[in-house]
Amino acid sequence: MEKRRAGLFDLDGVIFDTESEYTRFWREQGKLAHPEIPDFSSRLKGRTLKEILAEYFPQEQQAREIVRRIDDFERQMDFPFIKGSLEFVGILKQNGVKVAIVTSSDDKKMKNVYRIYPQLKTLFDAIITADRITRSKPDPECYLLAAEQLGRKPAECVVFEDSFPGLEAGRRAQMKVVGLATTNAEDQIRDKADRVIPDFSRFTFSDFVHLYSIK
């Protein structure tokens, strides 16, 4: 039965402890370009860079400058892991569970990730980026595509997410959802997930299997 299961992982705030860094980056860009939007960084959670540029930086020169800034920013990032995330992915693999990264990040950003952690290319059975989809979270397209690539039905998949759009995408894909309280407080996401965890340090394979019995 385990071999018909899959774990689908968002990247920032789930695998990597980087969400706070992106919040600071976009907060600064918001102060410079959109001081009239106080919650600028919050509005961008789960959205692709293409969408952000189209809506908030539509002028070509402005968009080009933002792309340059974020590329420089990501080149300097260390991409630290959320506690226990890499180990938990390994446990799923050992038990025959298919695993995928499902991220709103693009291929360009992933090149910076692979530069530091080339093993991620082979650790995950599929990697879905913003360049593979037409509609970003909260649309379920990315998670449904991941399930299809892994040869799994939605009911056989568990989504691990931290952002409101990502949690909603998992729900709309009709998958089990585990919320990580890394970006938002536990009480803010409790009603949007089947289980909420602070990180993966105490989340076991038995906990993972138990999710499938939740109605």
Question: For the regions a protein language model found, what residue spans apply to each?
Answer:
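Short, flexible loop segments at the rims of nucleotide/cofactor-binding pockets, characterized by
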Residues: R75-P80, S104, A173-Q174
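N-terminal helical cap/lid subdomain that shapes the substrate entry/recognition surface
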Residues: E2-N95
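Non-catalytic, surface-exposed connector residues within folded enzymatic/regulatory domains
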Residues: R43, R64, I82, S104, ...
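Asp-based, Mg2+/Mn2+-dependent phosphohydrolase catalytic module
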Residues: M1-R5, G90, D106-K215
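Conserved phosphate-coupling serine/threonine residues in phosphotransfer and NTP-handling enzymes
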Residues: V14, T103-S105
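Short phosphate-binding/catalytic loops that engage adenosine nucleotides
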Residues: N95-V97, M175
